[in-house]
Amino acid sequence: YMIAHGRRVVVTAAHVVRNESVMAIDGRDGETVVGQVAFIDHGIDIAFIVVPEIETRTAVRYRPQRRYDERLVGTTLTYTGFPSHHDLLTIRGYVSSIEKEHIVTNMFGWFGSSGSGVFDQQGRYLGIVSGIDVGTMGFGVRIPLESIVWVAPVSKLDHEMVKIRIITSVVPQTLNAFPGARAPRRGGLRD
């Protein structure tokens, strides 16, 4: 939950939003707001949702890390999210490599981590948790590698287009404004 270009936004994974135009966003203590999907990049796997104020959350300033090269390797990272059945968790790790248009990290992740915001120690936003790596054992058996987390980098976005889409988006004021808003999965269970 951030303030970007004078608006409140939630940034998540594009595969969470799919092709929806509005989403229900959960705060804490039962609070729910509805946001308009302002920008989606399925190739990078990032979506921006413009939301009204979430009273049970504190918005941080959107400060994107625009670097995307091997100088990121070794950078200490933190992400916060609602993986699996857990409430808010904070996980730390570091950048291992830059590969296939993503930032590959060494930090714990599991199903339900997708969309969690990833920040460096200076508070710059690197992107979102996009997925965990999958390795193969003999006979084609695939297993999740929970310590290798793929981050969709915000540095690969068209920042001017993101700004235009955020500024021109409608901010829904009530949950009833969009009665069919789909809620993203939270805590590994459908809302």
State what each model feature region is.
Residues 56-58, 125, 129-191:
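C-terminal cap/linker of serine protease catalytic domains
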Residues 8, 12, 35, 49, ...:
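Terminal peptide-recognition signature
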Residues 3-54, 72-73, 131-132:
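Catalytic-histidine neighborhood of serine endopeptidases
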Residues 27, 83, 120:
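Acidic surface patches and DE-rich sequence motifs
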Residues 31-33, 58, 91, 150:
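Short beta-strand segments
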Residues 15, 68-70, 117:
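Residue "hotspots" at secondary-structure boundaries inside conserved domains
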Residues 57-113, 129-143:
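Flexible, gly/ser-rich surface segments that form the specificity/activation loops bordering the active-site cleft
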